[in-house]
Design a protein with these regions (language model features):
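Flexible coil/turn and secondary-structure edge motifs
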Residues: 1-158
């Protein structure tokens, strides 16, 4: 099986990971940090809002079972891409909406989907999602991995 990677930031990574993990064709997920300026940051480092990292989910998927475009649709459907550095009550640059692409094809698909969602009328505000080349992914501490599943929860309850 040939797999591909996709990396997304869409708020607190616990709920984002749970959403992607359940998709048919997704072989694995990992939560972590990306897009910042500190090597191997801790959760506390990232929460300080001084590292520039986003909380992200790295998704490994089988493109013969689920396409990158389908994964993008799930991304857009499960967060608010119009709020800068915030999702719900969570505020800070680590909660920004970001797509980290792993290939020129992913970049093109992400840009096209952002344009389509922006023009769809679904949101009455500007879509602020960033689209950037995938930087080094720093895996988060083990207690964050599959956080909601370990606690028998299906979503974040704040």
């Amino acid at each position: 099986m040939t797999t591909e990677k996709a990396t997304f930031g869409a708020g607190c990574f616990w709920g984002v990971e749970e959403t992607f993990r359940k998709l048919k064709g997704v072989s694995s997920t990992a939560v972590g940090y990306a897009g910042g300026n500190r090597e191997n940051p801790s959760y506390e480092d990232v929460c300080s809002d001084e590292t520039g990292h986003a909380e992200v989910v790295q998704v490994e998927f089988d493109p013969s079972q689920i396409t990158y475009d389908q994964i993008l649709d799930v991304f857009w459907s499960n967060h608010n891409p119009t709020t800068l550095n915030r999702q719900g009550p969570d505020v800070g640059t680590q909660y920004r909406s970001v797509i980290f692409y792993h290939s020129p094809e992913q970049k093109a698909a992400a840009e096209k989907s952002k344009q389509e969602i922006s023009e769809s009328g679904r949101f009455n505000r500007l879509v602020v999602t960033q689209i950037e080349p995938a930087p080094k992914f720093w895996r988060a501490e083990e207690y964050h991995q599959r956080y909601l599943e370990k606690r028998g929860q299906s979503h974040c309850a704040i």
